[in-house]
Amino acid sequence: MAKARNTAFFCKECGYESAKWLGQCPVCKEWNTFVEEPVAQAKKAPSGQIAAVGAGKTAVPVHISEISLDEQDRTPTGFGELDRVLGSGIVKGSLVLVGGDPGIGKSTLLLQVCRNLAGAGKRVLYISGEESLKQIKMRANRIGVITGELLFLCETNLDTIHGAIERSKPDIVIIDSIQTMFREDISSAPGSVSQVRESTNLLMQIAKGYGVTIFIVGHVTKEGVVAGPRVLEHMVDTVLYFEGDRNDAYRVLRAVKNRFGSTNEIGVFEMEEKGLSEV
C-alpha cells in the first residue's frame, strides 16, 4: 500500500494543491508560486472535543417557495457608510473579509461597529490574535466602547474559538486577524496557505451552521491584495477593502465582492482622535 504523503505543494495565489513542485500553476497560471507545506492528516476527535458544525443533522431539501425572507435578517451597523457598501446592513450568517494595510484602521472600524451593535442589543464577540486584553481595553476606552454585551477573547486556536462561539452564542463575531489563526490538525505555521484556507473553511461552516455573522480581518501585501491564497476571497460572501494614506485622515471603504449587494458603492470615513467618523 502506498505511503501517505506528509507534505504537498500549494500555490500561494489560488491555493491549488499538487503532489510535486510546479513552475507554473495550472489553475491561476502564475509562475513560481508553489510552497511546500505539511498535509493535514485526518484525526479522530478526542473525547470532549466540540463536534463539527452540523454533525448529526439530516440534509432535507426545501422548495424555494417555502423559504421566507425576513427584513430582520439584515442588521444596521450604526454606520450609514458601511451599511451602504454592504448593501443595507449585515446579513445574518454571512462571512465578511475586511482587508487593508496594517495600521490603516481596520480594527478601529470593527471595534466601533461592535460598540454600535452591542449598544443595539446584539451579542458581539471580538477575538484578537494580535493584541492583549489590556491593549484592546485601552483602544476601546479611547473610542468610547463601554457597553456590556461586548465580549473579548485573546486566542489564535480556531478549534478553541469554535468552542467559545458555541458556548457564548454571539450574533456577531470579529476575527482579528486571519493571518494569526491556526487549526490544530494543520501542522504548518499560522498565515500559511493551508492554515488560512482551512481556518476560513471552518469559519464559513460556523457562520452558516450557527447563523452568526463573522467579520475576518486580513492584512494586504505590497501588491495590494489580501495576504494568503486568493481562494480566500472566493470562500467568503463579501470582500471589503479599507484604504487610505496613514499620513492623511481620510479612509475609503469599497467592496470588490458582495453576494448580497452592489460593488459600486464606497464609504468615506475620517480618522479622528476618538476613532473613525463618517464623512
Language model regions located:
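Conserved P-loop NTPase
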Residues: P26-E30, F34, A40-I64, S68, ...
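Short cysteine-rich clusters marking metal-coordination/redox-active sites
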Residues: C11-C14, C25-C28
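Flexible beta-alpha connector loops of hexameric P-loop NTPases
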Residues: E71-Q72, G99, G148-E155, R183-R197
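Substrate-engagement module of ASCE P-loop NTPases
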Residues: S194-H219, M235-R246
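Short metal-coordination and nucleic-acid-contact micro-motifs, chiefly zinc-binding Cys/His arrays
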Residues: R5-T7, W21-Q24
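Short glycine-rich substrate-engagement loop in P-loop NTPases that contacts/grips substrate
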Residues: F79, A140-R167
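Loop/turn-to-beta-strand initiation segments
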Residues: R123, E149, K169-I172, Y210-F215
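The Walker A/P-loop phosphate-binding site
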Residues: Q49-I143, H162
